[in-house]
Regions:
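Hydrophobic alpha-helical positions that pack around
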Residues: 1-93, 105-107
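Short, structural beta-strand-to-alpha-helix junction motif
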Residues: 92-100
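Terminal amphipathic helices with adjacent charged low-complexity linkers/tails
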Residues: 108-143
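Flexible, glycine/charged-enriched surface loops at secondary-structure junctions
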Residues: 62-70, 74, 109-118, 179-182, ...
């Protein structure tokens, strides 16, 4: 995969290990039934495997006390340069986002309008929601966001939201494996639509963008 974003999806990762093009496979069969070289395969990320050592050391009952009762354990987070204390931290799942921003990150060093949490295709969370949001999978799912790998990327007020959305479409177009045409074509079309709006060639249509996003999500295999 040579660092391809799509290899964050388990079947694409398996394809890459086998020497095939890094593309998503249809499921079922799932990797636990038929995975690497057609053998049953368990795919976990490094963070999950690292938690296994803590569970063996502390015991499962003690480990269950870490977190908020819904999401258990800890989560690595990374804070970008718009925080006064940027860096990599480990926090309990269920920690309030406001605590992460103010106490761990030391607040922002610029006027921020939103945070993108969870990677290049993670959720974009407006600042007015951050005060009530907690760092756990359930809270993010209920809010319509993805927690992902919990990177915190700040979007300053001075940066155009449309320009930022264009950047995300461009990233998707570059990283698409190309197997599903809604993603392969939709990402390019989304980038073109936003470019035209920025350049004043056509009016920005929120409805068209949402229709395109829904088509890409429903019509693709991985919906990354």
């Amino acid at each position: 995969g040579q660092g391809a974003y799509i290899c964050g999806e388990e079947t694409a990762l398996i394809a890459s290990i086998e020497g095939r093009r890094a593309e998503v496979d249809v499921r079922p069969p799932f990797p636990v039934v038929e995975g690497l070289y057609k053998k049953p395969t368990v795919v976990n990320n490094v963070e999950s495997l690292a938690a296994v050592a803590a569970i063996f050391k502390l015991g499962s009952e003690a480990y269950k006390t870490i977190g908020n009762g819904r999401s258990l354990g800890t989560k690595l987070i990374s804070l970008d340069g718009y925080f006064n204390n940027p860096g990599l931290y480990e926090v309990d799942l269920g920690t309030p986002i406001s605590f992460i921003i103010d106490e761990i990150g030391g607040g922002f060093n610029d006027d921020i309008k939103a945070l993108q949490i969870g990677g290049p295709l993670g959720g974009i969370v407006p600042v007015d929601i951050l005060k009530t949001l907690t760092l756990d999978f359930e809270a993010f799912s209920e809010g319509g966001f993805l927690l992902g790998h919990a990177s915190f990327v700040c979007i300053p007020k001075s940066f155009s939201a449309v320009e930022y959305a264009k950047h995300l479409f461009a990233f998707t177009a570059h990283e698409s494996c190309g197997k599903c045409f809604p993603c392969r074509l939709g990402s390019v079309r989304g980038k073109e639509m936003l470019e035209s709006a920025i350049e004043g060639k056509q009016k920005f249509s929120e409805e068209l963008i949402y229709d395109l996003l829904e088509t890409m999500e429903v019509g693709s295999l991985c919906a990354l």
